[in-house]
Design a protein with these regions (language model features):
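Signature of the first transmembrane helix
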Residues: 4, 15-79, 112-116, 240-270, ...
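Transmembrane helical elements of multi-pass membrane transporters/channels
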Residues: 20-40, 170-171, 175, 192-215, ...
């Protein structure tokens, strides 16, 4: 029964580290969520519902292209860089960062070209006129900074979650401040696009500066250089890992980042605006799971997957997140409607109907958050990819079908179904890996042998 004793849980140093790092990130995410609501509130009040929807679609389009193309280089740095640092192997860590940096540069270039090239073909479906089209094209130049996650991987590997927290508070502050100015002076659509653009640009630059400073402090020089194929040769299984996680994340983005765009295509910009408001509440409510996930992955990568310790750590973290999820869902249920009315106005109250449907998905997604990290730790990224593929195909089918049948409320039902599929299908390979854990490989150095 010791595994279910709460005091015993906190005797685990890794569990305490996860809680500590989550607290760092949580301190900034509470502020970020409030500032994000302020920015959306100003945009909602400063424009018509249709133009607010167009703004949301422009931002979601750029993020969707970024999410679809980019490699999950932060996972690469944590997967291979954390063991290298643990074993005092700076050269191997330098190889990992160089490979990761090169992937960011190449994928960022492909993403910006692809995003701008696709825009003329999608502009009519997205509801863009001539002015908003060019502003959307300008916003696409942010895609490389959105597609780069090497700096966050470095900061997680060196346990500098405080710097991540600082960046995560600064970007929404700048966005909120710019949105207040655009609303107060009635700068309209162009003003909000510029405000959001500048905040993203500054936020992305901060990550790179923090990461470079931490590398210098540890005397790890010349890590940020283009050396794609040579550095990869020193990292066993690197290409298999990055392609599996990239495809899995691209599929994930189709289910999440692209959802707002798809709703806009099927139902129009106004419906996309309502769905974005609901997703903002969902993302804010799901923040604890995201924070725990960012802290959980580096910790389990320091543990031997052949033992029960990382798996029990996953159970404890999932139960903790699920309990928090229930409390958060109840809070959103109680304050959601008056908060939407206060922040956005009564014309957006329909978003609360969507939120009510999506509350169950919050708890389910929180309970299942450790599964991805456990599968990556076990080297089962392809099994995770298969689960993501099936769940996402099911979600996209549900989204189109339910939107046609039930309107914008159908998008909420589809999202709930997609979250259930995701957790259920990922649980199957996770349980299989646990019962076969004695056959798993544990390569602490992360080097090619």
């Amino acid at each position: 029964m010791a595994g279910f004793n709460i005091k015993h849980w906190f005797a685990d140093g890794a569990f305490r580290t996860i809680i500590r790092n989550s607290a760092w990130l949580g301190s900034s995410n509470v502020v970020s969520a409030l500032l994000g609501l302020l920015a959306l509130s100003c945009a909602g009040k400063g424009m018509t519902p249709a133009m607010f929807g167009v703004l949301v679609i422009v931002q979601s389009y750029a993020k969707s292209i970024s999410d679809f193309i980019k490699f999950q280089t932060w996972q690469l740095v944590v997967q291979y860089g954390t063991p290298a640092l643990t074993n005092n192997n700076p050269q191997q860590f330098r190889n990992v960062v160089s490979f990761s940096f090169s992937l960011d540069i190449v994928s960022g270039a492909v993403a910006i070209v692809g995003g701008i090239a696709l825009l003329p073909f999608l502009s009519h479906s997205l509801g863009l006129d001539d002015q908003s089209f060019w502003l959307a094209a300008l916003y696409c130049t942010l895609i490389p900074s959105m597609a780069s996650s090497t700096p966050t991987g470095i900061l997680r590997a060196v346990d500098r979650f405080d710097l991540i927290a600082l960046q995560q508070a600064t970007k929404p502050f700048l966005r909120a401040a710019g949105s207040v100015v655009a609303w107060y002076f009635d700068f309209g659509f162009a003003g909000f696009v510029i405000a959001w653009y500048v905040s993203n640009l500054v936020g992305g630059t901060m990550y790179w500066w923090f990461a470079a400073r931490e590398l210098r402090r540890r005397n790890i020089h010349n890590a940020f250089k283009l050396n794609l194929f040579e550095s990869a040769r020193h990292i066993k299984g690197a290409w298999s890992f990055v392609w599996s996680t990239n495809i899995a994340h691209s599929i994930w983005s189709a289910r999440n980042s692209c959802s707002t765009v798809l709703v806009g295509i099927v139902l129009g910009p106004a419906a996309a605006g309502l769905f974005k408001i609901a997703m903002t509440f969902f993302d804010a409510a799901g923040t604890p799971a995201g924070l725990l996930g960012k802290s959980f992955y580096p910790e389990v990568m320091r543990l031997d997957p052949r033992t029960t310790r990382p798996w029990l750590l996953g159970v404890k973290s999932g139960l903790l997140a699920g309990g928090i999820g229930i409390l958060v869902a109840l809070a959103v249920f109680i304050v959601g409607k008056p908060l939407i009315s206060l922040v956005f106005g009564v014309k957006y109250l329909e978003a609360y109907d969507l939120i009510q449907v999506m509350l169950g998905a919050i708890v389910i997604s929180m309970l299942g958050f450790p599964q991805e990290s456990l599968l990556l730790m076990a080297g089962k990224q392809r099994a995770f990819l298969v689960a993501q593929t099936i769940a996402s195909i099911g979600y996209i089918v549900l989204l189109f079908m339910f939107c046609h049948l039930f309107g914008v409320l159908g998008a909420a039902f589809a999202y709930f179904g997609g979250q259930c599929l995701d957790v259920a299908l990922s649980l199957i390979p996770t349980l299989k890996a646990f019962f076969q854990r004695h056959s798993l490989l544990y390569n602490a150095a992360g080097e090619k042998s």
